Amino acid sequence: MRRLRAVPVALTVVAVASAVCALSLGTPYVPPARLPATLGSDGLAGIVVTELRLPRLVLALVAGACLGAAGLVLQEALRNPLAVPEMLGVSSGAALGVAAPLVLALSLPLGLQPFLALAGAAFGGLLTLVAAGFGRSPSSVLLTGAAVAAALQAGLLVLMVMADQLDLQLIYRYLLGSLSARTWDDVTGLLPWLAVALPALVLCVPVLGVLRLGDDDARALGVRVERARVAALGIAVVLIAPVVAVCGPVAWVGFLAPHLARRLKPDGGAAGWLVRSALCGAVVVLCADQPARLALAPVETPVGAWTALVGVPVGVVLLKRGRRAARRSDRGPAPAGPASDASLSVPGRATEPVRGAEPVPLLRKAER
């Protein structure tokens, strides 16, 4: 119990330390004690912290929370811990929707990028559901989604071959996910999408709790399973598409954050896991952005490379531990000995001795 209580405290400490590092470290360096006075000042340090580092910090938290919540919605709706946006064609479709106009030299305003990402993500997700029979089998949806994601990534490779050198560098950097050079305009561009997604998440939580019981039990309780899965996919698309439009596909946050949330409180339920998954996703992206910004300074590395580098092995370890714990709980306590066998015997029938076992004392006296 103490260990479970210490984990949220540790996450809070890590988040605060990462936030201080995000605002202090870099060029110019700002000591943590001077951060309150530096925010909003007219000097060089104040402009860098207020206009560059602080919006990047807020964007990392918002993007991570959206990806973590979307990952949990997909995993709960499909009842599969491997259901992630990268495996269902959602992230690849959103990236394709943003990259295609750039390569085709279409002059479109920047405000349309979230809508292009939304259209691409919806196309990839709906293509997965249509090919899998509208979610009749969670395993078939996952396998079909992997095939659709591979096809969309092949389309991205074709676009990269068609692009010139400058566009190729932009697309390559975009596909790895980056928070570099993001401003307050990028942060405010996510707010309308959050205003749509948050009420939908609140309405979706009870349905996710029912879907955990299985398709037959959910139908018996009045839930239309296929429509519920389509709605869950739509909510995940609304959460993922604007993040991909602004930051690119930040990989495997939707895989790691739900497993961390379940690890923190295994019996939390869909509502508790959703909040914890969003918080864990925000902390993961914020922590991953620090080595992305500072490891090879002054050159920045994509944050998506660090989330994939850390998220995949940690998520696999958490997944294995969760399965082991589930197996132990399913086995239950072992029988206490001959007394438990006697309690299971049917009255009126003689109990035959088990072969290879030592006879009980009453049988020994009868043999004498």
Language model feature labels by segment:
Residues M1-G348, V354-R368:
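Alpha-helical transmembrane segments in inner-membrane proteins
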